[in-house]
Design a protein with these regions (language model features):
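Hydrophobic beta-strand-centered segment that forms part of the acyl-chain substrate-binding groove
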Residues: 60-94
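Catalytic strand-loop segment that frames the active site of acyl-thioester-processing enzymes
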Residues: 13-48
């Protein structure tokens, strides 16, 4: 057996830690670039699930940004979203992310989204707080020279 490898993680400082219950919201209007790409032959133009998830994930990130040091950022590690209802072009969507818990540098969020009539999605999202320089180093090691 070879030598045992031990990873040394850069400490996560954070300005402050969000507490359970703290939340953030993002509102957006469903535009043409947000709709499903198969809205043809009688299929109505509605908000595509990948776009909905993008906005919901960014809502959790917005909740974290005030707590981060300039050397820190976040990366998503889990997305578990149930898309419950269609939302047509032009509707306003309100996304909400609420901190449920934290464990070290990992934060768990409850996510919800509502259009002008009803709840359209809910789920969970995990974010990790990372050191930007260390993360960039990991990416650089995977990048192939051109």
């Amino acid at each position: 057996m070879g030598p045992r490898l031990t990873r040394v993680h850069a400490p996560i400082a954070m300005k402050s830690r969000p507490r359970p219950g703290q939340a953030a919201e993002i509102r957006f209007v469903v535009e043409a670039n947000h709709i499903i790409d198969f809205a043809v032959d009688g299929m109505p133009a509605v908000l595509a699930t990948p776009w909905l998830i993008w906005f919901m994930e960014h809502t959790a990130r917005e909740a974290m940004l005030p707590h981060l040091e300039p050397t820190e950022s976040t990366v998503g590690t889990l997305v578990d979203i149930e898309h419950l209802a269609p939302t047509p072009l032009g509707q306003i969507v309100n996304c909400r992310a609420q901190v449920l818990s934290s464990d070290g540098s990992q934060f768990l969020f409850k996510l919800e989204a509502f259009d002008e009539q009803e709840k359209i999605a809910n789920g969970l999202h995990k974010l990790n707080v990372i050191n930007k320089a260390r993360f960039a180093g990991r990416v650089a090691r995977k990048t192939k020279p051109e």
